[in-house]
Swiss-Prot record:
It comes from Bos taurus (Bovine). Pro-inflammatory cytokine that is involved in a wide variety of processes such as chemotaxis, differentiation, and activation of peripheral immune cells, regulation of cell growth, apoptosis and modulation of angiostatic effects. Plays thereby an important role during viral infections by stimulating the activation and migration of immune cells to the infected sites. Coiled coil: none annotated. This is C-X-C motif chemokine 10. GO terms for molecular function: chemoattractant activity; chemokine activity; CXCR chemokine receptor binding; CXCR3 chemokine receptor binding; heparin binding. Residues 1-19 form the signal peptide. The gene is CXCL10. Gene3D superfamilies: 2.40.50.40. Belongs to the intercrine alpha (chemokine CxC) family. GO terms for cellular component: external side of plasma membrane; extracellular space. Monomer, dimer, and tetramer. Interacts with CXCR3 (via N-terminus). Keywords: Chemotaxis, Citrullination, Cytokine, Disulfide bond, Inflammatory response, Secreted, Signal. GO terms for biological process: adenylate cyclase-activating G protein-coupled receptor signaling pathway; antiviral innate immune response; cellular response to interleukin-17; cellular response to lipopolysaccharide; cellular response to virus; chemokine-mediated signaling pathway; chemotaxis; endothelial cell activation.
């Protein structure tokens, strides 16, 4: 094979390998989903993980203050939807307002 043929082969190989992910993790974080409610005061952290190629569903993971336990919550639950609305409402109230300087 001559040099130009080899270079074309390398370029084709590079373009084909560009879309290959480095990680092959194709699992969801949540195996079991709790349908129960969660007291907002007992939450340390609430993570909302959108659906992706590695997991086709939205995942909501609650970390509890007292023991650090992580619970997967049902994103379709009315209680959890209301909890997310309340948290978003609090965030908009807490966000700093910009002032116009004179």
């Amino acid at each position: 094979m001559n040099k130009s043929g080899f270079l074309i082969f390398c370029l084709i190989l590079l373009t084909l390998s560009q879309g290959v992910p480095l990680s092959r993790n194709t699992r969801c974080s949540c195996i079991e989903i709790s349908n129960g409610s969660v007291n907002p005061r007992s939450l340390e952290k609430l993570e909302v993980i959108p659906a992706s190629q590695s997991c086709p569903r939205v995942e909501i993971i609650a970390t509890m203050k007292k023991n650090g336990e992580k619970r997967c919550l049902n994103p379709e639950s009315k209680t959890i939807k209301n909890l997310l609305k309340a948290i978003n409402k609090q965030r908009t109230k807490r966000s700093p307002r910009t002032r116009k300087e004179a």
